[in-house]
């Protein structure tokens, strides 16, 4: 490798790391040292992660209705540095890795100027939906980006009659779906749908050997991630607890979660702004049919996002649920450029980007006082004179209390 290439790689890594630091520092306010603010869910993840580091087994000693991946990431964060600093470092590395990966993928499909614009749009949508950072979707964001890029590469080959699917890509799909299974199963909806499309295409073309290799690689990838967690929690007598928290409960939640007013204008605007990444491919397919070009590519992309889109429309899905789907936005932007035959992205693309900034400011206050809410402040005042080695009953206390008070919950259902 030449010195010039090494310098280019170093510059790319440094630039994207600095961008990731800025995004995390200013917008991921629940883990950023800039803000004295903690979210309810993020506090639970952090407390369980710290407890795991200290030897307290999730689900047995500290319980929450999530898969173990998010607790594992928070445990790693607390192992790197105390408090939320370690988690913040992991978030920076996560965002930087996604940007670096997207840089090398998009550079093959678009000019440098367009790559920058696509990444700006991606980041603006991310800060709109990230809800303070350290969410379940963040833990699988990098894998999601890799799966999307590998999938798109295969779709492009299919469009020119090359149907062979790489078993290595199938292995990555399995790793990603397993990671989603161990966090929130609906995060893997696009990958699962795309895998079904791959199976259908290979079966239709009677490529049985390639189909068998891909399915085997997918299963192996799934097992590689799932087995260590299954063995660990099984050895600690917590497998059934883990299974209920990561699968049974979330399946019930997804089945019974319905928006109270799905036809209201407010809900429609909320959905479009937060779930535009999975709405985009369907819109592009309609455009491709009208323009009569790139129809096969956009049909496969639309079929891949359709189940996730139907679920998001019908459920009471929070904005951060879209984080794991967000990398599909990169592919959609590339396809928009190809469909419209733009050499350069029009200037109004930046106007759309500014709209997301306005939406962000509207939904979240960029500058605010921070600190605990009124109930947590009252709880802190009541317990300020209680010695740290004493225990007490904490009824209806927000999990953020334990972080502000620097106390460790004794009861495993501390989040209820």
What are these regions (language model features)?
Residues 65, 196, 368-416:
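Short periplasmic/luminal acceptor-recognition loop of GT-C membrane glycosyltransferases, typified by
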Residues 89-111, 146-149, 153:
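Transmembrane-helix motifs of polytopic, lipid-linked glycan transferases
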Residues 100, 273-308, 329-332:
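Hydrophobic, aromatic-rich transmembrane alpha-helices
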Residues 102-126, 141-142, 161-164, 168, ...:
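Transmembrane-helix signature of polytopic, membrane-embedded enzymes
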Residues 108-110, 145-172, 205, 278, ...:
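Membrane-interface transmembrane helices that cradle and orient dolichyl/undecaprenyl
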Residues 131-140, 318-319:
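Short acidic/glycine- and proline-prone juxtamembrane loop motifs at membrane-interface regions
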Residues 189, 308-344:
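Hydrophobic/aromatic-rich transmembrane helices and adjacent perimembrane loops
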């Amino acid at each position: 490798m030449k010195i010039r290439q090494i310098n280019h790689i170093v510059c790319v890594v440094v630039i994207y790391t600095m961008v990731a630091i800025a995004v995390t520092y200013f917008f991921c306010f629940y883990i950023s040292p800039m803000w004295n603010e903690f979210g309810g869910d993020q506090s639970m993840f952090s407390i369980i992660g710290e407890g795991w580091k200290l030897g307290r087994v999730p689900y047995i000693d500290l319980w929450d209705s999530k898969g173990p991946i998010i607790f594992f990431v928070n445990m790693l964060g607390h192992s790197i540095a105390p408090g939320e600093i370690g988690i913040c470092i992991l978030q920076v590395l996560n965002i930087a890795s996604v940007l670096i990966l997207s840089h090398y993928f998009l550079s093959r499909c678009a000019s440098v100027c367009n790559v920058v614009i696509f990444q700006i749009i991606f980041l603006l949508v991310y800060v709109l939906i990230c809800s303070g950072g350290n969410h379940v979707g963040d833990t699988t964001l990098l894998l999601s980006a890799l799966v999307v890029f590998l999938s798109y590469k295969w779709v492009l080959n299919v469009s020119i009659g090359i149907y062979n699917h790489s078993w290595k890509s199938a292995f990555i799909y399995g790793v990603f779906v397993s990671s989603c299974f161990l966090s929130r199963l609906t995060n893997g909806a696009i990958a699962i749908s795309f895998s079904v499309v791959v199976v259908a295409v290979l079966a239709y073309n009677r490529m049985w050997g390639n189909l068998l290799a891909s399915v085997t690689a997918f299963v192996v990838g799934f097992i590689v991630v799932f087995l260590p967690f299954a063995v660990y929690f099984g050895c600690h007598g917590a497998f059934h607890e883990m299974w209920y928290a990561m699968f049974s409960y979330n399946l019930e939640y997804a089945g019974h979660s319905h928006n109270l007013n799905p036809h209201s204008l407010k809900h429609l605007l909320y959905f479009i702004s937060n779930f535009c990444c999975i709405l985009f491919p369907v819109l592009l397919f309609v455009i491709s049919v009208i323009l009569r070009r790139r129809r096969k590519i956009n049909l496969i992309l639309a079929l891949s996002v359709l189940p996730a889109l139907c679920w998001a429309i019908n459920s009471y899905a929070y904005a951060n649920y879209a984080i794991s789907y967000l990398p599909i936005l990169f592919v959609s932007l590339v396809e928009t450029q190809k469909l419209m035959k733009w050499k350069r992205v029009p200037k109004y693309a930046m106007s759309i980007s500014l709209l997301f900034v306005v939406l962000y400011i509207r939904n979240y206050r960029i500058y605010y006082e921070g600190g605990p809410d009124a109930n947590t402040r009252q709880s802190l005042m009541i317990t300020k004179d209680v010695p740290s080695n004493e225990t007490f009953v904490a009824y209806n206390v927000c999990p953020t209390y334990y972080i502000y008070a620097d106390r460790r919950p004794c009861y495993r259902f501390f989040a209820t």
